[in-house]
């Protein structure tokens, strides 16, 4: 999980940030991104791909990340921004915002996926994209954990005002119960109007 970071540290980059996002495929809520700079040469086995961890393991890993990170930042793009930009551009913008919020700032960023280069994100840092990076890079995995836990908590808070959509369980993702609630109650301001919210 540190091969990418070790190569960059050897090249003289001390503050290597991992970037990842959560919530691209959701019908409701923001897309949330995180940037995390971990200390050089420190490997933490609890930090793994967030999708491979239970909720409890993610929360424990988040606490470890918050204790150990040199810097961490979380950012989001709202449903309105998603509708205005499209989900891909909003996800990339959220990652750019997260990296911009790191203090101290990164001197290199590892970005999950392969869209950063393809979409010419306007960012000041040297970078490398890593497909399935949350399973290959500790820094990206740490960012995936922060983004996922932050977004899940936000959607559970929103559930209190809109329990009919079951966001406490589905956290905005497209489930049959979510589609059924949309048919019965319509969309909220938290839904992404550019997404297909209704289906037969």
From Swiss-Prot:
SUPFAM superfamilies tied to this protein: Ribonuclease H-like
Keyword Flavoprotein among record annotations: no
Binding-site positions, a divalent metal cation: 20-21, 112
Subcellular locations according to the entry: Cytoplasm
Catalytic reaction(s) noted: Endonucleolytic cleavage to 5'-phosphomonoester
Domain spans labelled RNase H type-2: 14-200
EC numbers, comma separated: 3.1.26.4
InterPro entries cross-referenced by the UniProt entry: RNase_HII, RNase_HII/HIII, RNase_HII/HIII_dom, RNaseH-like_sf, RNaseH_sf
Main location: cytoplasm
Gene Ontology BP annotations: DNA replication, removal of RNA primer; mismatch repair
Reported cofactor(s): Mn(2+); Mg(2+)
Single GO term (MF): RNA binding
Coiled coil region boundaries: none
Keyword set, alphabetical order: Cytoplasm, Endonuclease, Hydrolase, Manganese, Metal-binding, Nuclease
Co-factor remark: Manganese or magnesium. Binds 1 divalent metal ion per monomer in the absence of substrate. May bind a second metal ion after substrate binding.
CDD domains in the cross-refs: RNase_HII_bacteria_HII_like (cd07182)
Record keyword Nuclease present: yes
Pfam families: RNase_HII
GO cellular component, one term: cytoplasm
Protein function: Endonuclease that specifically degrades the RNA of RNA-DNA hybrids.
Family: Belongs to the RNase HII family.
PANTHER family named in the record: RIBONUCLEASE H2 SUBUNIT A, RIBONUCLEASE HII
Name assigned to this protein: Ribonuclease HII
């Amino acid at each position: 999980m540190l091969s990418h970071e070790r190569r960059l540290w050897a090249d003289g980059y001390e503050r290597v940030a991992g970037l990842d996002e959560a919530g691209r495929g959701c019908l409701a809520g923001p897309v949330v991104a995180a940037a995390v700079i971990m200390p050089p040469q420190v490997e933490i086995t609890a930090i793994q791909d967030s999708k491979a961890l239970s909720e409890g393991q993610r929360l424990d890993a988040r606490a470890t990340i918050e204790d150990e990170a040199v810097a961490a930042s979380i950012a989001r793009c709202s449903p309105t921004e998603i509708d205005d930009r499209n989900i891909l551009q909003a996800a990339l913008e959220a990652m750019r915002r997260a990296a911009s919020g790191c203090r101290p700032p990164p001197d290199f960023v590892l970005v999950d996926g392969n869209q950063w280069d393809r979409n010419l994100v306007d960012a000041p840092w040297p970078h490398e994209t890593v497909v399935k990076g949350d399973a290959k890079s500790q820094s990206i995995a740490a960012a995936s954990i922060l983004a996922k836990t932050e977004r899940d908590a936000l959607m559970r808070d929103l559930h209190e005002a809109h329990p009919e959509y079951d966001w406490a369980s589905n956290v905005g993702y497209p489930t049959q119960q979510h589609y059924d609630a949309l048919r019965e109650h319509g969309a909220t301001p938290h839904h992404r109007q550019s997404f297909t919210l209704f289906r037969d």
